[in-house]
Amino acid sequence: MSVISMKQLLEAGVHFGHQTRRWNPKMKRYIFTERNGIYIIDLQKTVKKVEEAFKVMRDIAAEGGDILFVGTKKQAQEAIKEEATRAGMYFVNQRWLGGTLTNFQTIQKRIKRLKDIERMQEDGTFEVLPKKEVVQLKKELERLEKFLGGIKDMKGLPSALFVVDPRKERIAVAEARKLHIPIIGIVDTNCDPDEIDHVIPANDDAIRAVKLLTSKMADAILEAKQGEETVTA
């Protein structure tokens, strides 16, 4: 059975690319036609690429690998958080902090600080501290949780990155490439596909399109995990 149908892709508006003047010629092989000044993505290729990406995600998860979901644009934030959480994986859906991968030790120090404040809140320390100090600590906790909450339990570097809009997430992409971490990405007609190991040509601006494709990647991880449970049962 196929992972995704043409009907699902059409209904979610996955085929709508960017305006023809805002395009990357390297995406030409994934473009079907041009309509009213907008490029239309070849959905037959998208179906094939979703299936390839699904297999990659499933194989990584089956080997016990962690996948970091990245999407900080408004249209992606909710889907990235929901689907990564559903799959038991990590995510960045606010601002990508430079060095999240290439300077992971420093990021871990910030995560330790986040967990320390959380512990203080839970063990009653807040109750004995001056009110002013508690207010400051709560603000710090909120900020740390916002940017690092999705990776606070990530023990080491991920085995792969799943990215929505590599153009927007160029720092994350550059860091992953530097560390030879494979990247699976939703790539629109204005992006450079050469930077992505496993390209899913698709509309990265429609909430429904992003949600549909991200949920399929989460399904791949869950399929691998269910397979493990069956083996151990």
From Swiss-Prot:
<dbReference type="Pfam" id="PF00318">
    <property type="entry name" value="Ribosomal_S2"/>
</dbReference>
<dbReference type="InterPro" id="IPR023591">
    <property type="entry name" value="Ribosomal_uS2_flav_dom_sf"/>
</dbReference>
<dbReference type="InterPro" id="IPR005706">
    <property type="entry name" value="Ribosomal_uS2_bac/mit/plastid"/>
</dbReference>
<keyword id="KW-0689">Ribosomal protein</keyword>
<dbReference type="GO" id="GO:0003735">
    <property type="term" value="F:structural constituent of ribosome"/>
</dbReference>
<dbReference type="InterPro" id="IPR018130">
    <property type="entry name" value="Ribosomal_uS2_CS"/>
</dbReference>
<dbReference type="InterPro" id="IPR001865">
    <property type="entry name" value="Ribosomal_uS2"/>
</dbReference>
<protein>
    <recommendedName>
        <fullName>Small ribosomal subunit protein uS2</fullName>
    </recommendedName>
</protein>
<dbReference type="GO" id="GO:0006412">
    <property type="term" value="P:translation"/>
</dbReference>
<dbReference type="GO" id="GO:0022627">
    <property type="term" value="C:cytosolic small ribosomal subunit"/>
</dbReference>
<keyword id="KW-0687">Ribonucleoprotein</keyword>
<comment type="similarity">
    <text>Belongs to the universal ribosomal protein uS2 family.</text>
</comment>
